[in-house]
Amino acid sequence: MGSSDSSSGSAPPRHQPPPPQQGSAPELPPGFRFHPTDEELVVHYLKKKAAKVPLPVTIITEVDLYKFDPWELPEKATFGEQEWYFFSPRDRKYPNGARPNRAATSGYWKATGTDKPILASGCGREKVGVKKALVFYRGKPPKGLKTNWIMHEYRLTDASSSATTSRPPPVTGGSRSASLRLDDWVLCRIYKKINKAAAGDQQRSMECEDSVEDAVTAYPLYATAGMTGAGAHGSNYDSLLHHQDSHEDNFLDGLLTAEDAGLSAGPTSLSHLAAAARASPAPTKQFLAPSSSTPFNWLDASTVGILPQARNFPGFNRSRNVGNMSLSSTADMAVDNGGGNAINTMPPFMNHLPMQDGTYHQQHVILGAPLAPEATAAATSAFQHPVQISGVNWNP
């Protein structure tokens, strides 16, 4: 019997996962963003890259930045939306100098500001790196055109770089590129600065256009509302005139009805007339006009022609002494009726009225409403009392 192959019983070798290839996008859960601090970039990425320690995730691409223009770099990155990270070598500008070469394809990078030291967190606050800001200019120095592309360059300090970076060997017939190498790796962040002034002007322009459109859209509504308001004011004024006219009509109708009735019932009819006048709505406006005959005059002269004439009431006699003057009222008092022959006398039911401001009270009791100057001039003559002053001879 042939011996069995010893290798047949051995377990197959385990498959090792291949290392992440350069340029492949990292597999991160949704919602994660790569936005490290300056210290994290230097300590956890640049130092490990310079020491040739493998990184857990290939999230920063190796690109020689100075062989491309900045607007070509975002498509070279494996990760990033508004800012992109790269590992890039640095070369010398001159073989025996220490200045880096900042020239690019169609322009150059110019340093701005001062270098910012990067300190490690902890008690010692050790300096672990340096941060430099650069701006890209189109054209050739020193007359290049400034752009909005910004670079933040992170490099290790001298103590760290002496142990982790490759210094160029002395020139002994080697290649020229090896003699110009200043640093094997620096870490760079690239982004494009947004012009806030232009963005603000654009925002204000859009808001202005929206305001104009809103105003144009709302103008017909305002015009319609204005016309409606004007119509409302006109209708209110018409209703005010109608209210005033109806009040005058009601009052005059009451006077005419009382005149047709003949005032046969005496005080009872007058009381009904006064009550009807008071029941009518008050006028909207009252105009006061001074008069020499009476202090209060409020009605038009048109009502004078329809005032009922006073009737004769025999037996009326009333007198009052005020100081040296004797005021008397008799039933046989003649009244001027404007040229007529009728004789008007004071009715006896007026005895219970006080004598103060007799004309004013008589107007309100008889008419139920105030009179205008022309009306009171005619009405007052009907109630004028003779005045007798002792010691004065009235006969010529």
Curated annotation (Swiss-Prot):
Reported function: Transcription factor of the NAC family associated with the grain protein content (GPC). Accelerates senescence and increases nutrient remobilization from leaves to developing grains. The tetraploid cultivated wheat (T.durum) contains one additional gene coding for a functional protein (NAM-A1) and one extra pseudogene (NAM-B1). Plays a weaker role in terminal senescence than NAM-A1.
Ranges of biased composition (kind: Low complexity): 1-13
Molecular functions (GO terms): DNA binding
GO cellular component: nucleus
GO BP of this protein: regulation of DNA-templated transcription; system development
A Pfam match: NAM
Matches recorded under InterPro entries: NAC-dom, NAC_dom_sf
Note: High grain protein content (GPC) is a desirable trait in breadmaking and pasta wheat varieties because of its positive effects on quality and nutritional value while Low GPC is a desirable trait for barley malt and beer production.
PANTHER family membership: NAC TRANSCRIPTION FACTOR 56 (PTHR31719), NAC TRANSCRIPTION FACTOR NAM-2 (PTHR31719:SF149)
Alphabetized UniProt keyword annotations: DNA-binding, Nucleus, Transcription, Transcription regulation
Domain notes: The NAC domain includes a DNA-binding domain and a dimerization domain.
Signal peptide: none
Protein location: Nucleus
Free-text disruption phenotype from the record: No visible phenotype.
Portion annotated as DNA-binding: 128-199
Tissues in which the protein is found: Highest expression in flag leaves. Expressed in green spikes, peduncles and stamens.
Domain NAC residues, every copy: 28-193
Region (Disordered): 1-33
Protein name, UniProt field: NAC transcription factor NAM-B2
